Amino acid sequence: DPVAVAQASLAFTQQAAQATMDLGRKFLSGLGIGGGSGPAALPGGRVRGPQAVEYVIARGGSQRGVPYSWGGGAINGPSTGVDQDAGKVGYDCSGFTRYAFAGVGVQIPKYSGDQYEVGRHIAPSQAKRGDLIFYGPGGSQHVAIYLGNGQMLESSSAAGQVTVSPLRTAGMTPYLTRIIET
Protein backbone atom coordinates (compact mmCIF):
# COMPACT_ATOMS: atom_id res chain seq x y z
CA ASP A 1 0.00 0.00 0.00
CA PRO A 2 1.75 3.21 -1.15
CA VAL A 3 -0.09 5.36 1.43
CA ALA A 4 1.09 3.13 4.28
CA VAL A 5 4.67 3.29 2.97
CA ALA A 6 4.50 7.09 2.73
CA GLN A 7 3.07 7.36 6.25
CA ALA A 8 5.76 5.05 7.66
CA SER A 9 8.45 7.07 5.89
CA LEU A 10 7.06 10.32 7.28
CA ALA A 11 6.92 8.89 10.80
CA PHE A 12 10.54 7.73 10.53
CA THR A 13 11.66 11.14 9.24
CA GLN A 14 9.89 12.89 12.11
CA GLN A 15 11.54 10.55 14.64
CA ALA A 16 14.97 11.12 13.09
CA ALA A 17 14.47 14.89 13.12
CA GLN A 18 13.45 14.79 16.78
CA ALA A 19 16.49 12.66 17.63
CA THR A 20 18.74 15.19 15.87
CA MET A 21 17.17 18.07 17.80
CA ASP A 22 17.49 16.17 21.09
CA LEU A 23 21.18 15.42 20.46
CA GLY A 24 21.87 19.08 19.68
CA ARG A 25 20.09 20.19 22.85
CA LYS A 26 21.99 17.62 24.93
CA PHE A 27 25.30 18.78 23.43
CA LEU A 28 24.55 22.44 24.14
CA SER A 29 23.31 21.66 27.64
CA GLY A 30 26.62 19.89 28.33
CA LEU A 31 28.41 23.08 27.33
CA GLY A 32 26.21 25.12 29.66
CA ILE A 33 24.29 26.75 26.83
CA GLY A 34 20.58 26.69 27.44
CA GLY A 35 18.80 24.27 29.69
CA GLY A 36 17.37 20.83 29.22
CA SER A 37 14.50 22.38 27.28
CA GLY A 38 16.76 23.68 24.53
CA PRO A 39 19.40 26.27 23.71
CA ALA A 40 19.25 29.85 24.92
CA ALA A 41 16.70 31.23 22.49
CA LEU A 42 16.54 34.72 21.11
CA PRO A 43 13.65 36.26 19.20
CA GLY A 44 13.47 34.82 15.70
CA GLY A 45 14.59 31.33 16.70
CA ARG A 46 18.27 32.18 17.21
CA VAL A 47 20.58 30.84 19.93
CA ARG A 48 23.56 32.33 21.75
CA GLY A 49 27.11 31.26 22.18
CA PRO A 50 30.37 30.62 20.38
CA GLN A 51 30.07 26.91 21.19
CA ALA A 52 26.81 26.80 19.25
CA VAL A 53 28.54 28.39 16.25
CA GLU A 54 31.36 25.85 16.42
CA TYR A 55 28.86 23.00 16.66
CA VAL A 56 27.04 24.25 13.53
CA ILE A 57 30.36 24.45 11.67
CA ALA A 58 31.49 21.03 12.90
CA ARG A 59 28.15 19.49 11.97
CA GLY A 60 28.32 21.03 8.51
CA GLY A 61 31.99 20.10 8.12
CA SER A 62 31.19 16.48 8.89
CA GLN A 63 29.31 16.41 5.58
CA ARG A 64 32.30 17.40 3.41
CA GLY A 65 32.34 15.28 0.29
CA VAL A 66 28.59 14.56 0.33
CA PRO A 67 27.30 15.14 -3.23
CA TYR A 68 25.48 18.27 -4.32
CA SER A 69 21.86 17.45 -5.13
CA TRP A 70 19.48 20.23 -6.13
CA GLY A 71 16.49 20.19 -3.75
CA GLY A 72 18.27 17.74 -1.45
CA GLY A 73 18.89 17.98 2.27
CA ALA A 74 16.79 18.00 5.41
CA ILE A 75 17.32 18.70 9.10
CA ASN A 76 18.32 15.07 9.65
CA GLY A 77 20.77 14.74 6.75
CA PRO A 78 21.09 14.36 2.99
CA SER A 79 18.05 13.42 0.93
CA THR A 80 17.13 12.88 -2.70
CA GLY A 81 17.01 15.92 -4.90
CA VAL A 82 14.43 16.97 -7.46
CA ASP A 83 14.28 17.53 -11.21
CA GLN A 84 17.71 16.78 -12.72
CA ASP A 85 18.92 15.43 -9.36
CA ALA A 86 15.91 13.21 -8.66
CA GLY A 87 17.24 10.01 -7.17
CA LYS A 88 20.59 11.59 -6.22
CA VAL A 89 21.15 11.79 -2.45
CA GLY A 90 22.89 14.90 -1.17
CA TYR A 91 22.36 18.55 -0.30
CA ASP A 92 21.65 21.70 -2.17
CA CYS A 93 23.01 24.88 -0.59
CA SER A 94 20.01 25.72 1.58
CA GLY A 95 19.30 22.12 2.55
CA PHE A 96 22.90 21.95 3.77
CA THR A 97 22.69 25.10 5.92
CA ARG A 98 19.34 23.96 7.26
CA TYR A 99 20.94 20.66 8.34
CA ALA A 100 23.91 22.40 10.00
CA PHE A 101 21.73 24.72 12.11
CA ALA A 102 19.23 22.03 13.09
CA GLY A 103 21.96 20.49 15.24
CA VAL A 104 21.62 23.34 17.72
CA GLY A 105 17.84 23.27 17.67
CA VAL A 106 17.37 26.08 15.15
CA GLN A 107 15.09 25.31 12.23
CA ILE A 108 15.62 27.68 9.36
CA PRO A 109 13.51 27.64 6.18
CA LYS A 110 14.45 25.41 3.25
CA TYR A 111 14.72 28.15 0.58
CA SER A 112 17.81 30.40 0.66
CA GLY A 113 15.77 33.55 0.01
CA ASP A 114 13.73 32.80 3.14
CA GLN A 115 16.89 32.00 5.13
CA TYR A 116 18.20 35.47 4.23
CA GLU A 117 15.28 37.00 6.13
CA VAL A 118 15.52 34.87 9.31
CA GLY A 119 18.41 36.37 11.28
CA ARG A 120 19.98 39.76 11.85
CA HIS A 121 21.62 41.36 8.82
CA ILE A 122 25.34 42.07 9.25
CA ALA A 123 27.67 44.14 7.09
CA PRO A 124 30.37 41.98 5.46
CA SER A 125 33.03 43.93 7.40
CA GLN A 126 31.45 42.63 10.65
CA ALA A 127 31.18 38.99 9.57
CA LYS A 128 31.88 36.29 12.16
CA ARG A 129 32.22 32.52 11.95
CA GLY A 130 28.82 30.93 11.46
CA ASP A 131 27.18 33.86 9.68
CA LEU A 132 25.34 32.97 6.48
CA ILE A 133 26.58 34.42 3.19
CA PHE A 134 24.03 34.88 0.41
CA TYR A 135 24.17 35.43 -3.33
CA GLY A 136 21.66 36.75 -5.83
CA PRO A 137 18.71 39.11 -5.36
CA GLY A 138 17.37 38.72 -1.82
CA GLY A 139 19.65 35.73 -1.26
CA SER A 140 17.70 33.71 -3.79
CA GLN A 141 20.58 32.00 -5.61
CA HIS A 142 23.00 30.57 -3.03
CA VAL A 143 23.87 30.39 0.68
CA ALA A 144 27.05 29.33 2.49
CA ILE A 145 28.43 29.38 6.06
CA TYR A 146 31.21 31.88 6.75
CA LEU A 147 34.27 30.26 8.37
CA GLY A 148 36.50 33.31 8.71
CA ASN A 149 39.88 33.95 7.08
CA GLY A 150 38.28 34.31 3.65
CA GLN A 151 36.75 30.81 3.69
CA MET A 152 33.21 29.46 3.53
CA LEU A 153 31.56 26.05 3.90
CA GLU A 154 28.98 25.26 1.25
CA SER A 155 27.21 22.66 -0.79
CA SER A 156 28.46 23.81 -4.16
CA SER A 157 26.96 22.88 -7.49
CA ALA A 158 30.25 23.90 -9.15
CA ALA A 159 32.32 21.59 -6.90
CA GLY A 160 29.58 18.96 -6.96
CA GLN A 161 29.77 18.43 -3.21
CA VAL A 162 29.92 19.94 0.27
CA THR A 163 33.28 21.71 0.44
CA VAL A 164 35.32 24.54 1.91
CA SER A 165 35.77 27.29 -0.68
CA PRO A 166 37.41 30.71 -0.86
CA LEU A 167 34.91 33.47 -0.08
CA ARG A 168 33.40 34.88 -3.27
CA THR A 169 32.22 38.48 -3.29
CA ALA A 170 30.82 38.59 -6.84
CA GLY A 171 27.03 38.48 -6.64
CA MET A 172 27.02 38.53 -2.84
CA THR A 173 24.09 40.26 -1.11
CA PRO A 174 24.88 43.52 0.73
CA TYR A 175 24.48 41.75 4.09
CA LEU A 176 25.24 38.44 5.74
CA THR A 177 22.73 36.94 8.16
CA ARG A 178 23.61 36.13 11.76
CA ILE A 179 21.49 33.37 13.27
CA ILE A 180 23.60 32.72 16.39
CA GLU A 181 24.67 35.65 18.55
CA THR A 182 28.04 35.27 20.26
Task: Give the role of each language-model region.
Residues 1-69, 179-182:
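Intrinsically disordered, low-complexity
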Residues 13, 46-53, 86-94, 120, ...:
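Solvent-exposed, acidic/flexible segments
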Residues 43, 68-129:
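Catalytic cysteine-centered active-site loop
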Residues 58, 95-98, 142:
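A broad detector of short, well-ordered amphipathic alpha-helices
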